[in-house]
Amino acid sequence: MAQSKGLRNMTVGSPAGHIFYFALPLLAGSFLQQFYNMVDSWVVGNFVGDGALAAVGVGAPVIFLFSSLFMGVSNGGTVVIAQFFGAGKPERVRDAIDTVYTAFVCGAVPLSILAVLLVKPLLFALRVEDAAYHEAFVYLMVVCAGLVGTIGYNLNAGILRGLGNSRTTLLFLAVSTILNIVLDLLFVLVFRWGVFGVAFATIVAQAISWLFGLTYINRAYPDFAIRPFCFRFDRELFKEIMRIGLPSGLHMSLVALGSMVVMSKINSFGHDFTAAYNVGSKLDSMAFLPIQSLASAVVAYVGQNMGAKKMDRVRKGVRVTLVSSVVWATVMLVLIPLGPTLIGFFSDTPAVIEAGARYLTCIMPFYLLFSVMFCLNNAMQGAGDSLFSMINAILSLILVRVPMVYFLANRFGPDYMYYGIGIGWVVGCALSIVYYLSGHWKRFGSLADK
């Protein structure tokens, strides 16, 4: 079904082949994004200062919090589009694209305005040190003002993933990453704009990537062209998108909220400790990218096969994803002995290097369990059940992780707080396994029947 045009039908053929083929461009794109993040950290850490490096780290969960609602809608759109595409109903795919873009046009600007208004209260709640406060404020104000481009890019990517196309999203991301790096170097090294330059480079690059993606999709796939101002809105279909997307968005918001609460505790130990966490978390995030790409691939794979009512293929795809993810999580343990060397690339401050290396030693073993939880939750989301992920986040990330982080940090010292993050993942993994084995996530069936 339109596979020659880059739209991949995953309801036939090898499950492993489809998942790996779909995941590879996502992985390449994620490496590009992380490469940019590391260049960003290198530029900020070496040419602006550790205070600015801490400020950028503080900003990450805040930005994720603001964008997560529309990212959830995008995920809901991906699942709905994938199921209709797998069921062979292009006219319903068309309806879903129009509906989700109408929601974006009506809601993105108000969200950006709200985000700008909430920057100062959130920084106060995060207890950001005076040394990093001004730079964190500038960074967040600029990025929040430009959230429209970030949300639009994610929406384009979500539509294409639902259609089985992950290669084109790599092109969009390549445009954004290359432009971002060039502008970073220009604004920071040449214009000397500091953190403002880093933030401005980000929003310009993402806005251009969004508009480029819009033009590309409309020319390459006229049957599924994006019409931002058509204002075609299918209310029943939007309810279905929100049934899947709203819990997904709230789940991501809870992840961001939990990260912000943890970040508040991290900030209380000084900007060297915050900078170390920022660099260490970038390193483990990069190592996690293959698992993240497989989990993203399984959403579209499960969605298409649920739409086609092929449960046996769904189960096979989930098994392939789980085994591959656990194997890679084991490989990730190599970051522990390499920690000091890798942290030293971003900062020459001994306290930052030491604290960053300890972070990797504490957190990396828990990724074995986190990979299982992440893949199972994504697979069940592809089947139309995203409510469980939200409930799991409330239980494991808010009710377990946050209290454990504070308890361990206060009782045993700052380094032990990272075990609180790991304990949250242990609980989340156990809940995901039990729920997946229960089979309750299959209850929604194929959207094509509705």
For the regions a language model picked out, list residue spans one by one:
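Transmembrane alpha-helical segments of integral membrane proteins
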Residues: 374, 400-409
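Short alpha-helical transmembrane segments in multi-pass integral membrane proteins
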Residues: 1-23, 81-148, 190-246, 302-366, ...
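Residue-level signal for short hydrophobic patches within transmembrane helices
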Residues: 12, 16-35, 39, 62-69, ...
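Short runs within selected transmembrane alpha-helices of multi-pass transporters and secretion channels
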Residues: 74, 142-161, 169-177, 198-213, ...
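Small-residue-rich hydrophobic transmembrane alpha-helices
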Residues: 53-113, 150-169, 263, 277-338, ...
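Helix-terminus/linker motif at the lipid-water interface of multi-pass membrane proteins
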Residues: 31, 35-53, 123-130, 186-193, ...
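Transmembrane helical elements of multi-pass membrane transporters/channels
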Residues: 21-40, 142, 153, 176, ...
